[in-house]
Amino acid sequence: MNEINNIRGKTAVVGLAEAGCGVTPGWTAMELMATAVHDALDDAGINLSQVDGLFAATAFHSMAAMSLSEYLGIRPKFADGSNIGGSSFLAHVITAAIALETGLINTAVIAYGSNQRSAGGFKTISEPMPYESDYNPRMPVSAYALAAQRYLHEYGAKKEDLAQVAVSARDWALLNPRAYMHDRGPLTINDVMSARPIVDPLGKLDCCLVTDGAAAIVMTRSDKAKDCKSTPIYLLGAAMEHHHRMISEMPDLTRTSAYESGQRAFEMSGYKPSDMDTIQLYDAFTINPILFLEDLGFCKKGEGKDLIKNIGPSGTLPVNTSGGGLSCVHPGMYGLFVTLE
């Protein structure tokens, strides 16, 4: 076992919270994020003064961790504001685990917040993509539409297969009172297929929600976790992999970096895909869960279009049980909400 795998079971999530999910007029992104932090600490039974590691990323703050620590009035020994998009917070979990295990810090908080829906617009610190900007794509949906179109072509999938992902997500949301679409009723394949086109083959209901929302988790070492108020959730396996940022640089439009990172995360954990009772995936668009299920090893390449028929409440493989980004909440960067669920 290499050195990085030594973080297996050495740290745990001991508190978690979300705040302002849906529409929260009058709140700033920072206020929402700070509220989630306080609630997560309360869930853990830990005082704010004990937080010495802070991790945050948003689309609105170039130095999110510094801004949040200033707002909270704390002076962390370790801060990380790395922003790699919606997966930033999964990367923060790994960095926090290493910082905790090496003794750099004792208590880590990972946080995110956005008021993009109630603010009525989208502000971003993201720079233009040099090989794509001249073509004026509607990002990020154009990128995922390219991946979806290629998948449909290469594996004989249909738009109805994409629609099934949205239908299953809504079915889960109907069971979740916290979900933004909880009271909106079920979806049918025809509902999704007949929704307003966005970028072919994706329509409006193939795309994630636009909501406000904030989330936070608290992590500590396993030896301290047993003293916290909530039941610890131990980190058993984690990994990262990055191939590209621009869709034009993606080596294979139907294969994500989860193919590599998933194998290493499972190896670290000592488990395999068939051991999983539930799966939480980033579903910004309906193509995502299909690709991730394949790349993570839950089925062979090209078989995801069939497996997704079994991911709803009546199926055999519970996926995105909150309703996911398609029907529960999606305030711009969804990764931390996947972790919470």
State what each model feature region is.
Residues 1-82, 98-102, 112-208, 215-216, ...:
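Conserved "HGTGT" condensation-loop signature of ketosynthase/thiolase-family condensing enzymes
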Residues 86-88:
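Short helix-initiation/N-cap motifs at beta->coil->alpha
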Residues 91-92:
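Active-site histidine-anchored catalytic micro-motif
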Residues 107-111:
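Short, well-structured beta-strand segments enriched in hydrophobic/aromatic residues
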Residues 214-222:
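Conserved beta strand-loop-helix elements of the APE1-like EEP
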Residues 224-228:
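Short helix-loop capping/hinge motifs at secondary-structure junctions, enriched
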